[in-house]
Amino acid sequence: MIKCTRRIEFDAGHRIIGHQNKCQFLHGHRYVLEIAIAANKTDKLGMVIDFGLIKDVAKKWIDENFDHSLILHQDDKEMGQQIENCTGQKIYYMQNNPTAENIATHLKNEIFPKLFVGQNFFVSNLKLYETPNCFVEV
């Protein structure tokens, strides 16, 4: 198997409902996403995927949905609506707490498979850095 990885950076805020520490409060991160696309063999040009295609597809989705947004649990809609009404802030709701683990799993299992359809490659894994020292991999 051959993998090509593209790094995408974005800024977003979130909070973790029910967390007993400071992550229960609204705060933000400079996220770094590494998306690995894999195939069993290269195409006729000798590539798994053009790195530009990863950028065009994945980064476009990230920019439209996550970048400079507030990522919240769907149970946080009341707060999200108040923030959106007061500031115009873009809000993205998830079905579960927006932990790094859940965000990465959501992207890998629900979002990116719909974006990279009908190709001879697949999203093999994602790394999502919440800080320079802390990341999850799915």
UniProtKB/Swiss-Prot annotation:
What's the name of the protein? 6-carboxy-5,6,7,8-tetrahydropterin synthase
Locate the active site: C23, H68, E130
Provide the alphabetized UniProt keywords. Lyase, Metal-binding, Queuosine biosynthesis, Zinc
Pathway of this protein?
Purine metabolism; 7-cyano-7-deazaguanine biosynthesis
UniProt source species: Rickettsia felis (strain ATCC VR-1525 / URRWXCal2) (Rickettsia azadi)
Which residues are involved in binding Zn(2+)? Answer: H14, H27, H29
- What PANTHER family does its record include? 6-PYRUVOYL TETRAHYDROBIOPTERIN SYNTHASE, PYRUVOYL TETRAHYDROBIOPTERIN SYNTHASE
Q: What class of enzyme is it?
A: lyase
Keyword Transmembrane belongs to the record: no
List the catalytic activities from the record.
7,8-dihydroneopterin 3'-triphosphate + H2O = 6-carboxy-5,6,7,8-tetrahydropterin + triphosphate + acetaldehyde + 2 H(+)
Q: Name one GO molecular function term.
A: 6-carboxytetrahydropterin synthase activity
Q: Name one GO biological process term.
A: queuosine biosynthetic process
